[in-house]
Amino acid sequence: MIQAEEAIRAARGLIGTSYETLDCINLIKKVIRTCVGGDKRYTTAGTNALWDSDSKRGKYRDLTWKQAGISGAKAGMLAFMGVGTGDVSHTGLVTERGTVIHSSKSRGGVVETELTAKAGWNGLGVHRMIEVAENAGAVPTGTAYIVCAQTGLRMRKRPDVRGEYMQMLSD
């Protein structure tokens, strides 16, 4: 299984590659073939077939989950264009920044752009080879107060001497 961060790093390394060299589906294939945890022999059909790959009749069965719409996008998911039209025409990799890395014919190659419905993105999927980052970009915030006691360390949310401990570590 490829970690989302690794997949995104690999895709970002391909930004600027011409569309003639690497179209959108081949960008996804290249990421899966070259990342640690990937499969050097991985293949899939076109973008429309990838979108349909969650069905039992699908040849490749690459998606483990999909939805119409882009709400709830997480780093490592695939974004799609054309969902609901019968012709899913484009795909890219969702990043931790809420952007999508994709190979755009109109822009001439691999780019990173906003992931918005206005831009045409209207579907999400989870690929069986790429682990979605559940807490992408999550950074603990706030202050914790450490109290040294004879029985070990105790962590509080507030500096007062009363109240519940968040965590206690014995010596």
Locate predicted features.
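Active-site nucleophile-His-acid catalytic modules used for acyl/amide transfer and hydrolysis
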Residues: 4-22, 39-40
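SH3-family beta-barrel domains
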Residues: 133-157, 168-170
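...with weaker cross-activation on analogous glycine-rich loops/strands in unrelated enzymes
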Residues: 2-5, 38-124, 131
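Short, solvent-exposed loop/turn positions at domain surfaces
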Residues: 66-67, 160-166
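Solvent-exposed, acidic/flexible segments
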Residues: 1-4, 20-25, 85, 168
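Residue-level recognition of short, solvent-exposed, well-ordered loop/turn junctions
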Residues: 71-74, 164-170
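Solvent-exposed, polar/charged alpha-helical surfaces in well-ordered, non-transmembrane soluble domains
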Residues: 5, 9, 13, 26-30, ...
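Active-site nucleophilic cysteine motif
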Residues: 19-36
